[in-house]
Amino acid sequence: MMGVLGAVFAGGCAHYATVEHPPVVELRSIETVGILKFEVPEGDPEIGEDATHRFIATVQRAQPGTRVLELGTKREVLARIGARTLDPAALQAIGKMSGVDAVLSGSVEVKRPRTGVNIAGLTAVRTTVKVDASMKAALHETGKGAMLWTNGASGTWNLGGVTASERGVGGGMADPVRKHAEIMAELVRVTTEDFRPTFSRRRVD
């Protein structure tokens, strides 16, 4: 439901109200959401567990009361129901087996760092290290297996670099643990934007 949060007077006669708009996707209307551990096409499988927990925490902060049941990995769940792919029949079977009304699945990928070299004139050379990362997520209902929502995020992050010139060598690399947390937080923030309310200002005469 749309709600007026507050008002600010301006210009003598007119004033403006801050209006809250509901999320695009209201997860609290779903009895129980089952979540599959995020897949990791390439890299450390622990990244998937981290992404899954961050996703759940972000959604439940945005919509307190959302009921989530962790189901395990997609491979484990499909094996339990004797299916090969997450198709409508498999989603229906998951619903019956686990008692969930919707299934949220996703993937996260952090590529291998890549190095670039930039030559500034004849006196300086800068080497940079960057990494590409992406996240995808989808929500299906288990009644007929229809897709209710999907979204994703991707980006490139700078890990650091070194500059060499006639003045010497300088630079450094970012702390890997802090950079990983930064990347995961940003991917989750963008991917879950449809689960958060938005706000706008409206003139009230």
PLM ranges: what are they?
Residues L86-P88, T123, M173:
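Short alpha-helix boundary/capping motifs
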Residues V117-L122, A164-S165:
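Outer-membrane beta-barrel translocator domains and adjoining extracellular loop/strand segments
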Residues L91-A93, G121-R126:
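Short, P/G- and charge-enriched loop/turn segments at secondary-structure junctions
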Residues I30-R112, A138-T142, A146-T150, A181, ...:
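N-terminal segment of the mature soluble domain
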